[in-house]
C-alpha cells in the first residue's frame, strides 16, 4: 500500500467559510469553523453520494428491483429455508446484524462481522477481503457457503424455478429460458444498488443547511477531517477509500489468525489487512471491526485513539491520536449525524414472498 502521508490538502466545503462565529457548547466554546481542509489522496472529498449507475449490459428496471428485493428477503435461497440475505444484512440493524460475527445455517457462526449492504454499490470490491469484484459476484457467494446458506447453486435454482410466482417474474424480467444463478445474482444486485443512504444531517449541512449540525457535531466534523486522521482512510462520498488496512486487531485464535486480504493477493503487505467500511450509518450497526470486537462507537474510537493494536504489519497510518474526552464525544456525535434519514433506506420493510407460492 505504501505511505500516503504526502496527500493533497484541499477545501471540502466552501459553505463552511460563512461559519465564522464561535459556537458555544455548554460552558465550553467551540472554535469557529472557517474552512475545513481535508488531507485526501487525489481529487476526492467527503460529501453527498453521487447516483448509482447500472453495470454495462445489465440495465435496471422496477420489475428487476422488485424481484431482487423478493429474493433478498426469501430464505428459500438457503438449503433448509431458514436463512435469507436479510438474516445477516438486516435493514433494521443498519443493513448488517447485531452479532460480532454472522450466523448462518444450523446456527453456525462465521469468522467475520457482516458488512453492510447499504452503499455497497460504491465499493470497488466486495467482502472484507475484497474477493468479489461486483455485487453480482458477491451475491452468489453466500448461497453455496457451507456456513451461511449451505446450498448449491443448482439446488437453489431448482427451488426458485419450482415456485410459480418466481417463474413468471423471471420471465417478465429476463424473457424466455431457464432461470440461472446469474439472473438471481443480477436481480439481487439491482435491489442492493437502491440501498443508498442519500440523506443525513451531514448531507443536509453540505447542501447548505447550516443549522443541520449542532455545535458538537460540527466540532466532530472538524476532528474527523483533522486531528482524528479519519479521512486518511474514510474519504470520498461514501467515507471509505475502498482499500485494505491492517489495524492491529488482535487475532481471536493466534494459532490460526484471519489473514484478511492476504488470502486473496498473497502479497505480504496485505497480511491482516481488511477493507475500510463506510462510516455512513455506522452508529446503527454495532459492534465494529471485521471481527466485531469493539462493542460501541466509544470503544472503537478509543481503539483508534490508542493507535490501534500491535502487529508487525500495522498500517503506518495507525498512530496515537491524543484525543480528549470532549473530542471523542464530538467525534461520536458527528458519526451519528451520518445516519440516513431517508425512510426508503432506513425503514425498508421486509417482503414475505409467500404470495409467490400461491
Q: Locations of the language-model features?
A:
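Periplasmic c-type cytochrome electron-transfer domains
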Residues: 2-7, 19-358
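Sec-dependent N-terminal signal peptides
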Residues: 8-14
Amino acid at each position: 500500500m505504501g505511505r500516503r502521508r504526502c496527500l493533497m490538502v484541499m477545501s471540502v466545503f466552501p459553505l463552511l467559510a460563512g461559519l465564522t462565529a464561535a459556537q458555544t457548547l455548554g460552558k465550553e466554546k467551540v472554535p469557529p469553523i472557517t474552512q475545513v481542509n481535508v488531507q485526501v489522496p487525489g481529487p476526492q472529498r467527503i460529501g453527498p453520494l453521487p447516483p448509482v449507475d447500472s453495470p454495462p449490459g445489465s440495465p435496471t428496471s422496477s420489475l428487476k428491483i422488485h424481484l431482487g428485493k423478493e429474493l433478498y428477503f426469501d430464505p428459500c435461497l438457503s438449503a433448509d429455508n431458514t436463512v435469507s440475505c436479510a438474516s445477516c444484512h438486516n435493514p433494521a440493524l443498519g443493513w448488517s446484524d447485531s452479532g460480532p460475527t454472522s450466523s448462518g445455517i444450523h446456527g453456525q457462526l462465521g469468522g467475520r462481522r457482516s458488512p453492510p449492504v447499504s452503499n455497497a454499490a460504491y465499493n470497488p470490491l466486495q467482502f472484507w477481503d475484497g474477493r468479489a469484484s461486483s455485487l453480482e459476484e458477491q451475491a452468489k457467494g453466500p448461497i453455496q457457503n457451507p456456513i451461511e446458506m449451505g446450498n448449491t447453486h443448482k439446488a437453489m435454482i431448482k427451488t426458485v424455478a419450482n415456485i410459480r410466482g418466481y417463474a413468471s417474474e423471471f420471465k417478465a424480467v429476463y424473457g424466455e429460458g431457464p432461470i440461472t444463478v446469474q439472473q438471481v445474482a443480477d436481480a439481487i444486485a439491482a435491489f442492493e444498488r437502491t440501498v443508498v443512504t442519500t440523506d443525513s444531517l451531514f448531507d443536509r449541512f453540505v447542501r447548505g443547511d447550516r443549522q443541520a449540525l449542532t455545535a458538537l457535531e460540527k466540532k466532530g466534523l472538524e476532528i474527523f477531517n483533522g486531528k482524528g486522521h479519519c479521512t486518511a482512510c474514510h474519504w470520498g462520498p461514501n467515507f471509505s477509500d475502498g482499500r485494505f488496512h491492517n489495524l492491529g486487531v488482535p487475532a481471536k485464535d493466534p494459532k490460526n489468525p484471519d489473514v484478511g486480504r492476504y488470502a486473496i493477493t498473497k502479497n505480504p503487505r496485505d497480511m491482516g489487512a481488511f477493507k475500510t467500511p463506510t462510516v455512513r450509518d455506522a452508529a446503527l450497526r454495532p459492534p465494529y471491526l471485521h471481527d466485531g470486537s469493539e462493542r460501541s462507537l466509544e470503544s472503537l474510537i478509543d481503539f483508534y485513539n490508542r493507535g490501534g493494536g500491535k502487529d508487525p504489519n500495522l498500517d503506518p497510518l495507525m498512530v496515537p491520536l491524543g484525543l480528549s474526552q470532549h473530542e471523542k464525544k464530538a467525534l461520536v456525535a458527528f458519526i451519528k449525524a451520518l445516519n440516513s434519514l431517508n425512510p426508503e433506506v432506513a425503514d425498508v420493510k421486509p417482503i414475505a414472498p409467500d404470495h409467490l407460492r400461491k
